């Protein structure tokens, strides 16, 4: 009898990396993961990765989003262990991606080709579970609830995810590559292809050369962009960027008395056709906007402004035709578009291997935080069973 049939409908005891206090190392503890309820699936995590969003919430020590204890992690791949009632389209053994961005497949926006903003669910990122509010599926050794993280919580051997946040994928794709498609790569590629719709011969500038920014570069490279300018303070990112088609580099620390946008405009005659802000700083969003050409320049904001600061845009610049828009998850509908990305990878159209710079065991998860925080990794794969 396999383990799935033994554990189905019962709590599972497993290891999880728990954040008990802001900024402190995660603690690997034994926890209990309850069985899935209606519309939920319990997943065995195969591997997970670390995103800057995880680091942001790891440091967060106040406000409604700061909750302890908590299981972080949202970029991962797993296998279905068991399903709850009213679950269609998933079965034991399916390879799946848990995704923080929901798709209910019923609301006006999910049905429309114009947006990926699920109006049924996307406004709530405070709950533990999508349909059951603050009810948690995790308990520590003392029987106390552990908070979920943006409906995924992948820093655990098992997790429970609502079907609105779950995508079934082909088992042919390597699982480490698949994990990247659940957040960073999908966000960058989607922004380049679906939101910006970059044309051949375009000039592009990308602010921030982390995994999202490099995925943008890969996307515009495949669209035939003629000039791809990367902006980053870390000179090591420049060599990595070349593998994704970046042709020119700007280090803000070396711009002297000029602003970044002034340097970009000089490099591109009057400005870039497309500008992508992948960091999440209001000041850089403004610089990204000023870096684009009058008449048709388009700025896409992918980074989340951590302090929710406003940005200031010149009304005359808007009148002259420059535009700016934001995007969550690159404008992609997870259930519809992620399988397409998987297929393009399997057809060898996408270079994603170079995004993985480190691999660690689950017990080494705190090292992954330090590598990313210090700018020494792009993506670190954390293996649950190695």
UniProtKB/Swiss-Prot annotation:
Q: Required cofactors, per record?
A: Zn(2+)
Leading EC class: oxidoreductase
Q: How is this protein annotated for GO cellular component?
A: cytoplasm
Q: Can you tell me which residues bind Zn(2+) 1? A: 51, 53, 74, 183
Q: Where does Zn(2+) 2 bind?
A: 104, 107, 110, 118
Question: By its UniProt entry, which InterPro entries does this protein fall under?
Answer: ADH-like_C, ADH-like_N, ADH_Zn_CS, GroES-like_sf, NAD(P)-bd_dom_sf
Subcellular locations according to the entry: Cytoplasm
Q: Which GO terms describe its molecular function?
A: alcohol dehydrogenase (NAD+) activity; zinc ion binding
According to UniProt, the reaction catalysed is: a primary alcohol + NAD(+) = an aldehyde + NADH + H(+); a secondary alcohol + NAD(+) = a ketone + NADH + H(+)
Q: Which cysteines are joined by disulfide bonds?
A: none
- Coiled coil regions, renumbered to chain: none
The note on cofactor binding and number reads: Binds 2 Zn(2+) ions per subunit.
Q: Which Pfam families match?
A: ADH_N, ADH_zinc_N
Chain positions recorded as an alcohol binding sites: 53, 74
Keyword Oxidoreductase found: yes
Q: What is its EC number?
A: 1.1.1.1
Q: Which keywords has UniProt assigned to this entry? A: Cytoplasm, Metal-binding, NAD, Oxidoreductase, Zinc
Binding of NAD(+) occurs at 53, 208-213, 232, 237, 302-304, 329, 379
Listed under subunit, the entry gives: Homodimer.
Spell out the family assignment given in the record's similarity comment.
Belongs to the zinc-containing alcohol dehydrogenase family. Class-III subfamily.
Q: Which PANTHER family match?
A: ALCOHOL DEHYDROGENASE, ALCOHOL DEHYDROGENASE-LIKE 2
Q: What name is this protein filed under?
A: Alcohol dehydrogenase-like 2
Q: Which organism is it from?
A: Arabidopsis thaliana
From which lineage does this chain's organism come?
Eukaryota, Viridiplantae, Streptophyta, Embryophyta, Tracheophyta
């Amino acid at each position: 009898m396999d383990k799935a049939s033994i554990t189905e409908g019962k709590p599972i005891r497993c290891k999880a990396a728990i954040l008990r206090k802001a900024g402190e190392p995660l603690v690997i503890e034994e926890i209990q993961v309850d069985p899935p309820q209606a519309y939920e699936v319990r997943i065995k995590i195969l591997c997970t990765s670390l995103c800057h969003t995880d680091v942001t919430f790891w440091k967060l020590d106040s406000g409604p989003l700061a909750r302890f204890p908590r299981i972080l992690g949202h970029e991962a791949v797993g296998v279905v262990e068991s399903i709850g009632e009213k679950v269609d389209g998933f079965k034991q053994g399916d390879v799946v991606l848990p995704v923080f961005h929901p798709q209910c497949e019923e609301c006006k926006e999910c049905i429309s080709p114009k947006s990926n903003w699920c109006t049924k669910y996307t406004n709530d990122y405070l709950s533990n579970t999508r349909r059951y509010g603050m009810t948690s599926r995790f308990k520590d050794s003392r029987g106390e609830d552990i908070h979920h993280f943006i409906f995924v919580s992948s820093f655990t051997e098992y997790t429970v995810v609502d079907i609105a946040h779950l995508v079934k994928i082909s088992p042919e794709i390597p699982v480490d590559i698949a994990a990247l498609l659940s957040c960073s790569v999908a966000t960058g590629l989607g922004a380049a292809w679906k939101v910006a719709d970059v044309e051949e011969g375009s000039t592009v500038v990308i602010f921030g050369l982390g995994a999202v920014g490099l995925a943008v570069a890969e996307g515009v490279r495949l669209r035939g962009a003629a000039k791809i300018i990367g902006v980053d303070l870390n000179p090591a990112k420049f060599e990595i960027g070349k593998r994704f088609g970046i042709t020119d580099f700007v280090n803000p620390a070396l711009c002297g008395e000029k602003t970044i946008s002034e340097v970009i405009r000089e490099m591109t005659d009057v400005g870039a056709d497309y500008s992508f802000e992948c960091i999440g700083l209001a000041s850089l969003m403004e610089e990204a906007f000023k870096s684009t050409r009058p008449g048709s320049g388009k700025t896409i904001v992918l980074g989340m402004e951590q302090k929710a600061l406003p940005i200031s845009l010149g009304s005359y610049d808007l009148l002259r035709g420059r535009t700016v828009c934001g995007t969550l998850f690159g404008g992609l509908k997870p259930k519809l578009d992620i399988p397409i990305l998987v297929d393009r990878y399997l057809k060898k159209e996408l270079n994603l291997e170079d995004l993985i710079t480190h691999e660690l065991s689950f017990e080494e998860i705190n090292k992954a935080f330090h590598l990313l925080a210090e700018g020494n990794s792009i993506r670190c794969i954390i293996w649950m069973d190695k």
